[in-house]
Design a protein with these regions (language model features):
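Charge-rich (acidic/polar
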Residues: 1-113
Length: 113
């Protein structure tokens, strides 16, 4: 995720005045990633001992935390996006569109056939 953030930061060519909004967005994004990574690591450590219901409830917790994190990320992204110039907004739109296309391609490669 850090590489993606670094790439987006370079593409946006932010001004000094925009850096605070960027820092909030990047910190929120990385905090969310760390939280979910920790939850999956904990899940892996306890997976063998989980009952079927524990498994589903644990996964539900992870998905809920992902959704909460996505909400925080959306708020931080909105603040950043509002500070961008029209050209920077276009760059951000392209970046996120490209990321989503890649995610869809990976999903389809795993689930087709």
């Amino acid at each position: 995720m850090q590489r993606q953030l670094d790439r987006l930061h370079r593409q946006l060519k932010l001004t000094q005045a925009q850096e605070a909004a960027w820092a909030q967005f990047a910190d929120t994004t990385l905090g969310n990633v760390r939280q979910i990574d920790d939850l999956y690591k904990d899940r892996a450590q306890h997976f063998e001992a989980m009952s079927a219901i524990d498994n589903v409830k644990n996964y539900q917790t992870i998905i809920q935390r992902e959704a909460e994190g996505l909400g925080r990320r959306a708020v931080a992204l909105q603040a950043l996006y509002d500070a961008l110039s029209p050209e920077q907004k276009q760059a951000a739109d392209r970046f996120f569109r490209y990321q989503e296309e890649r995610r869809e391609q990976r999903y389809m490669a795993r689930h087709s056939g």
